[in-house]
Swiss-Prot record:
Organism phylogeny: Eukaryota, Metazoa, Chordata, Craniata, Vertebrata
Places the protein is found: Secreted, Extracellular space, Extracellular matrix
InterPro entries: C1q_dom, Collagen, Collagen/C1q_domain, Tumour_necrosis_fac-like_dom
Span list, region Triple-helical region: 57-519
Function of the molecule: Type X collagen is a product of hypertrophic chondrocytes and has been localized to presumptive mineralization zones of hyaline cartilage.
Region of interest called Disordered, as start-end residue ranges on this chain: 54-521
Protein name from the UniProt record: Collagen alpha-1(X) chain
Keywords linked to the UniProt accession: Calcium, Collagen, Disulfide bond, Extracellular matrix, Hydroxylation, Metal-binding, Repeat, Secreted, Signal
Signal peptide, first to last residue: 1-18
Species per Swiss-Prot/TrEMBL record: Bos taurus (Bovine)
Length: 674
């Protein structure tokens, strides 16, 4: 019923106006997206024309809007409209909650984002003390710290006495002492009475008999030639000898070949002759021909002319060829400060500068709790062998050893007739020394036999029991000096009296460099009555000193080895070796090292090494036609026998340049001992 009523209303409007207003219902515009699927939209796809005569009259006044008709049935859905471009509408109110759906076990969802950090809760009650934790693993070494400020030098308390040093090398043997005066013979005792008498104990050895007269000279065979001796030292140049007398002239030699034709020299001018008699005046001669033009004359310089007017400015000349780079000039005097220029634009961010000087020392913080003992660190690698030390001073002479125990005296043997010398037999066991027999008559000297081969050494005998101390005997003949085994070092004896000065020996080889001398101080530097001792290894404040500055005298050193800076400006402590280019630490502490190099020809890459490990690198990219500079510095802690040097690690970047007047240098000094 409702659709029919709407259709009749539309037909009546068409009859009045003659034209049917075609209305198309479109989807709402302004919202992007797919066409709406609502079922309330419809459209009429064709126009309905009225029947009869259409009279077009004037348009009347639009009437008031009629009452809204009842809601019609939803028409069929029209075709989708063009997508709109409107702005999204306001968000609708949330709909009523739908009925609960059937429950089903869903898949676990993705983990949600972490929530916001909650507020800090109240502190809980203090828990019981837990068990002590195990020491954690040893952490990696931290970066080297910034050097602290120079401390105030205060003389410290004397440290405890160090351990006793190792015993020094055995000293030279002392001079042989003089033999003691033999004692007086005691009084002869009374004759003893005994029945049957036991043989008495062995008496003391008697004094050595007087030396017999020398025998006739023996006839021995000529010995073998000895080994050639060592070449003697070169003697001093002798005094030039006197000039010898002239020798007699030799016989006349054969005539020589004819020499080339000589060119005679003009002789000396002759003595002028006496003036002749003046002659008669002759007839005037015919005029001669014109002579040759004379030599150009040299007139005296005339007076300087007036100053001429300034000429026009000449054209600029063509640029000359590029000259060779001259040597670096001496730094000129500082010029007058120029006027301040206008504020320029902000430049690009510069390279970060070197770390600044350390700030003032902060106040001492509270002492923290004692930490747990850390795990024992791994043993470090053994350092490089140090240079051999200088020879120590000779030790004091040890005390003279006790005299050896005299062996038991052997029984006297029966003197036999002298036999022919036989071959040398094997050495027998050592016999008991016999009593000194009475001097027999001198026998006929025998013929000296040939020298036999050296026999094998005998079996050493058992040590005898200690006998009584014998009376000092007369000095024996001088023995053969053989160096014995070094005995244990005895305690130092008291210094002996000064001996007589010996004869001057041969000049020895040059010794190692001696310790540096003392530093002289000006008179006004020292207070009255005070003379502080300052050595090369100790500064004015009493702290130890270790410093050096060296220069490289040759450009382009070798690759992969320490750079030998061989020209020394300061190296009194001898801690830097100019032959190897290595600085060896003798005083453990904190050191400061710096280097300044010039670069020419190619790039330069320099490394500062400590015990074979690079500490830092410096690189300079060379620009052709320029002389570049590069520098670097570092603070390093060193222990004894640590070594530091500079090295070129790459063969492609070896442009280290150091000629005669453009120096590359390397310096280092001790900041604070540890």
């Amino acid at each position: 019923m409702l659709p029919q009523t709407a259709l009749l209303l539309l037909m009546s409007l068409n009859l009045v106006h003659g034209v049917f207003y075609t209305e198309r219902y479109q989807t709402p515009t302004g919202i992007k997206g797919p066409p709406s699927n609502t079922k309330t939209q419809f459209f009429i796809p064709y126009a309905i024309k009225g029947k009869g005569v259409s009279l077009r009259g004037e348009q009347g006044i639009p009437g008031p809007p009629g009452p809204a008709g009842p809601r019609g049935h939803p028409g069929p859905s029209g075709p989708p409209g063009k997508p709109g471009t409107g702005s999204p509408g306001p968000q609708g109110q949330p709909g009523l909650p739908g009925p609960p759906g059937p429950s089903a076990t869903g898949k676990p969802g993705l983990p949600g984002l972490p929530g916001k950090q909650g507020e800090r809760g109240l502190n809980g009650p203090k828990g019981d003390i837990g068990p002590a934790g195990l020491p954690g693993p040893r952490g990696p070494p931290g970066p080297p710290g910034i050097p602290g400020p120079a401390g105030i030098s205060v003389p410290g308390k004397p440290g405890p006495q160090g351990p006793t040093g190792e015993p020094g090398p055995r000293g030279f043997p002392g001079e042989k002492g003089t033999s003691g005066v033999p004692g007086l013979n005691g009084q002869k005792g009374e004759m003893g009475h005994c029945t049957p008498c036991r043989p008495g104990e062995r008496g003391l050895p008697g004094p050595q008999g007087p030396t017999g007269p020398p025998g006739p000279p023996g006839v021995g065979k000529r010995g073998e030639n000895g080994l050639p001796g060592q070449p003697g030292l070169k003697g001093d140049q002798g005094v030039p000898g006197e000039r010898g007398a002239a020798g007699p002239s030799g016989p006349q030699g054969p005539p020589g070949e004819q020499g080339p034709e000589g060119i005679g020299k003009p002789g000396a001018p002759g003595i002028p002759g006496q003036p002749g008699i003046p002659g008669m005046k002759g007839q005037p001669g015919a005029p001669g021909t014109a002579g040759l033009p004379g030599a150009p004359g040299f007139g005296k310089p005339g007076l300087p002319g007036l100053k001429g007017q300034r000429g026009p400015v000449g054209l600029p000349g063509s640029p000359g060829a590029k000259g060779e780079q001259g040597p670096a000039g001496h730094p000129g005097e500082a010029g007058l400060p120029g006027p301040s220029g206008n504020m320029g634009p902000q430049g690009p961010k510069g390279i970060p500068g070197n770390p600044g000087l350390p700030g003032p020392k902060g106040e001492m913080g509270p002492v923290g709790p004692a930490g747990n003992p850390g795990a024992k660190g791994e043993r470090g690698s053994s350092g490089l062998d140090g240079k051999p030390g200088y020879p120590g001073e000779p030790g004091l002479n040890g005390p003279k050893g006790n005299p050896g125990l005299p062996g038991p005296k052997g029984d006297p043997g029966i003197a036999g007739s002298p036999g022919l010398p036989g071959p040398v037999g094997p050495a027998g066991a050592k016999g008991v020394p016999g009593h000194n027999g009475e001097a027999g008559p001198r026998g006929v000297p025998g013929i000296p036999g040939t020298r036999g081969p050296i026999g094998p050494p005998g079996i050493p005998g058992f040590p005898g029991s200690k006998g009584d101390v014998g009376t000092p005997g007369p000095p024996g003949p001088a023995g053969i000096a053989v160096k014995g085994l070094n005995g244990p070092t005895g305690p130092p004896g008291p210094p002996g009296p000064r001996g007589n000065a010996g004869e001057p020996g041969l000049p020895g080889p040059p010794g190692p460099p001696g310790p540096p001398g003392q530093v002289a101080l000006p008179e006004d530097f020292v207070k009255a009555g005070q003379r502080p001792f300052v050595s090369a290894n100790q500064g004015v404040t009493g702290m130890p000193v270790s410093a050096f500055t060296v220069i490289l005298s040759k450009a382009y050193p070798a690759i992969g080895t320490p750079i030998p800076f061989d020209k020394i400006l300061y190296n009194k402590q001898q801690h830097y070796d100019p032959r190897t280019g290595i600085f060896t630490c003798k005083i453990p502490g904190i050191y400061y090292f710096s280097y300044h190099i010039h670069v020419k020809g190619t790039h330069a890459w320099v490394g500062l090494y400590k015990n074979g490990t690079p500490v830092m690198y410096t690189y300079d990219e060379y620009i052709k036609g320029y002389l570049d500079q590069a520098s670097g510095s570092a603070v390093i802690d060193l222990t004894e026998n640590d070594q530091v040097w500079l090295q070129l690690p790459n063969a492609g970047s070896n442009g280290l340049y150091s000629p005669e007047y453009v120096h590359s240098s390397f310096s280092g000094f001790l900041v604070a001992p540890m």
